[in-house]
């Protein structure tokens, strides 16, 4: 059985120093359709950048730029 290829952290590859909470288009990629923050093994981020993404998403939710949950049906 072959091992799946390991995902490369996008932020490390692009040498991103700071993940801005105001960049909602970037942060929406790391939120599920239910509004949850995607896991590191799903998103492919390294541990440091996953923490930074989580903090940015939480700040963005606090500032009402991103929703806490998915929209009701």
Curated annotation (Swiss-Prot):
GO terms for biological process: translation. Keywords: Ribonucleoprotein, Ribosomal protein, RNA-binding, rRNA-binding. GO terms for cellular component: cytosolic small ribosomal subunit. It comes from the Bacteria. One of its GO terms (molecular function) is small ribosomal subunit rRNA binding. InterPro entries: Ribosomal_bS18, Ribosomal_bS18_CS, Ribosomal_bS18_sf. Coiled coil: none annotated. Pfam families: Ribosomal_S18. The keyword Ribonucleoprotein applies. Part of the 30S ribosomal subunit. Forms a tight heterodimer with protein bS6. Belongs to the bacterial ribosomal protein bS18 family. NCBIfam families: S18. Binds as a heterodimer with protein bS6 to the central domain of the 16S rRNA, where it helps stabilize the platform of the 30S subunit. This is Small ribosomal subunit protein bS18B. It comes from Frankia alni (strain DSM 45986 / CECT 9034 / ACN14a). The gene is rpsR2.
């Amino acid at each position: 059985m072959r091992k799946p290829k390991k995902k490369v952290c996008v932020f490390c590859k692009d040498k991103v120093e700071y993940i801005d909470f105001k960049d909602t288009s970037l942060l929406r990629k790391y939120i599920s359709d239910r509004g949850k923050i995607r896991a590191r093994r799903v998103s492919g981020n390294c541990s440091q950048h996953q923490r930074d993404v989580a903090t940015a998403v939480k700040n963005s939710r606090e500032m009402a730029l991103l929703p806490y949950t998915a929209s009701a049906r």
